[in-house]
């Protein structure tokens, strides 16, 4: 996945129609995309300039810790570390890596944050896009240096048992950034907010009209932007993964930016969009990608077994078809 850069799906924000409360809107660049924050003003809250200064600092810290586009970031330094000796990392990076490992198990290996060399080989990372589709020999060489089983956590350190192991947290760290900002807003006494970074969102409370925040899930169309569903997630985070915008074509074949760890190639299934709800945007972010890799049958089976609210949009000969897990269906009926 092009790190920090491409929002896998656009989620449109909708409001109600009662007399509006005072709403503050903050925005800015981060992680190769943008952030948008809306919150309802309350007595005793710090002024918006003070809040935004701290939000920018927090997001810059996430970049300094986890961006693979910054050669001196904590994660980049670990990737450049070719020894099997433990490498000390921050509590924040450790938290995100731990969740990535947990989600790897939950998705039966479909979410693997060590596929960075394959992502780069296909031209969706810091490396330039290849002039031709990679050969089997090139794929096998990159696959030999991937696998989350080669990554170990001990205390506050990470270690690897193959020197070339490369960790790319782009499938999960953007959601972490949303959580960092949302947690900060709550620490400041803000009870009604929407935090969005590159399409990943966390919500709490009510919007300016005194009704729950409403989110539009985009129809997975390349040519135009339109709405597939409108939901009220409540106090949940929402993340969507899709392959319908970030891809390249060669010789009439479309290659998605989402890589299947088992083949080393871009995914090749009928699922074009996966939306996940969770209390943590980091978790929703990672699950959306992992379930997309798994495909319709396996992905929905995992969603049902673990009571995960999931909406899959699948391409058929007649257009698009929705598949909602049992935990997601109540959100569709609101």
UniProtKB/Swiss-Prot annotation:
Cofactor field: Mg(2+)
Keyword Magnesium in record: yes
Signal peptide range: 1-16
Membrane topology classification: Lipid-anchor
E.C. no: 2.7.1.180
Residues that span the membrane, as ranges: none
Principal location class: membrane
GO CC terms, sorted: plasma membrane
Lipid sites, type N-palmitoyl cysteine: 17
Stored Pfam families: ApbE
Catalytic activity: L-threonyl-[protein] + FAD = FMN-L-threonyl-[protein] + AMP + H(+)
Subcellular location as annotated: Cell inner membrane
Enzyme class at the top of the EC tree: transferase
Covalently lipidated residues, kind S-diacylglycerol cysteine: 17
Keywords: Cell inner membrane, Cell membrane, FAD, Flavoprotein, Lipoprotein, Magnesium, Membrane, Metal-binding, Palmitate, Signal, Transferase
Residues annotated to bind FAD: 31, 69, 110-112, 168, 174, 259
Family (UniProt): Belongs to the ApbE family.
Known role: Flavin transferase that catalyzes the transfer of the FMN moiety of FAD and its covalent binding to the hydroxyl group of a threonine residue in a target flavoprotein such as NqrB and NqrC, two subunits of the NQR complex. Cannot use directly FMN instead of FAD as substrate.
Official protein name in the record: FAD:protein FMN transferase
């Amino acid at each position: 996945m092009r790190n920090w850069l491409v929002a896998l799906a656009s989620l449109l924000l909708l409001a109600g129609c009662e007399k509006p409360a005072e709403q503050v809107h903050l925005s800015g660049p981060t992680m190769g995309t943008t952030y948008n924050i809306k919150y309802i003003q309350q007595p005793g809250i710090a002024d918006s300039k003070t809040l935004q200064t701290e939000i920018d600092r927090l997001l810059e810290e996430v970049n300094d810790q986890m961006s693979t586009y910054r050669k001196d970031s904590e994660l980049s330094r670990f990737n450049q570390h070719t020894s099997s000796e433990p490498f000390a990392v921050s509590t924040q990076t450790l938290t995100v890596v731990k969740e990535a490992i947990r989600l790897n198990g939950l998705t039966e290996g479909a979410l693997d944050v060590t596929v960075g060399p394959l992502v780069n080989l296909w031209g969706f990372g810091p490396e330039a896009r290849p002039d031709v589709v990679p050969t089997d020999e090139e794929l096998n060489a990159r696959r030999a240096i991937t696998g989350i089983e080669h990554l170990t956590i001990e205390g506050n350190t990470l270690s690897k048992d193959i020197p070339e192991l490369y960790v790319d947290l782009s499938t999960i760290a953007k959601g972490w950034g949303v959580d960092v900002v949302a947690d900060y807003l709550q620490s400041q006494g803000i009870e009604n907010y929407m935090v969005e970074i590159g399409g990943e969102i966390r919500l709490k409370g009510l919007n300016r009209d005194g009704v729950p925040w409403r989110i539009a899930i985009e129809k997975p169309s390349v040519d135009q932007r339109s709405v597939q569903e409108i939901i009220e997630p409540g106090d949940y985070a929402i993340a969507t993964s899709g392959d319908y915008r970030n891809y390249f074509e060669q010789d009439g074949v479309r290659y998605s930016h989402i890589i299947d760890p088992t083949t080393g190639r871009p995914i090749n299934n009928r699922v074009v969009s996966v939306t996940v709800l969770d209390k943590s945007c980091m978790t929703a972010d990672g699950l959306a990608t992992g379930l997309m890799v798994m495909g319709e049958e396996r992905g929905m089976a995992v969603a049902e077994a673990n009571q995960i609210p999931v909406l899959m949009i699948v391409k058929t000969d007649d257009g698009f078809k929705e598949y909602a897990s049992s935990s997601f269906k109540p959100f569709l009926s609101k």
